[in-house]
Amino acid sequence: MTDCQLAAELRGIIRRRRQKLGVGAQSRAARELAKKICILPEYQSARRIALYLSSDSEIDCRFIIKAAWRAGKQCFLPVLRTDNPKAHQMDFVSFTPGSPLGFNRYGISEPTKGAKIATSALDLVIVPLVGFDRDGHRIGMGGGYYDRAFEFTRMQKNGVNALNLPVLVGVAYHLQEVLNIRPKPWDVTLSSIVSV
């Protein structure tokens, strides 16, 4: 079995685990996640935060978004580029309480209007994932969108953010943790992972 086949099989297993969580458990986890994120020094000092709107039983970020708005922080959401769908690229667009939403080609909610921000101008990025390990490696949905958007962060060495790059924090349920993920050369390593 190839690495790609193994990753696809692992994605399926973890997604099925996630989908078995009841609505109540998902809501409690989302609230607990918001509490954990909001006490992080990286969150407290951040002015521009990228998040996501959950789909496919991903852990929900809406409580983090609401807390960020109350704290006067700017929120941004990923929007898939439509000019070349095969390129698997995305931009981040401002997200406010009144932002109109639509669905992208994967059925995920995203803003239909808003100001774009350069990924390098973000302070904190809350990253969705399917699986993770303790070394900050993640398995995403397989499209490579986050790896492409944040490939410039590979300059970070030994956890030092000397170039004032965005801090990438993966968020997940505990049940999404796996023992070891073999990263590919293009994979972006997360700064940390917060799980509940």
What are these regions (language model features)?
Residues 1-5, 9, 16, 111-115, ...:
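Surface-exposed, charge/polar-rich loops and edge strands
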Residues 2-121:
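N-terminal active-site beta-alpha-beta segment that forms phosphate/nucleotide-binding
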Residues 60, 145, 177:
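Short phosphate-engaging motifs
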Residues 62-69, 146-151, 190:
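Short amphipathic alpha-helical segments and helix-helix/interface helices
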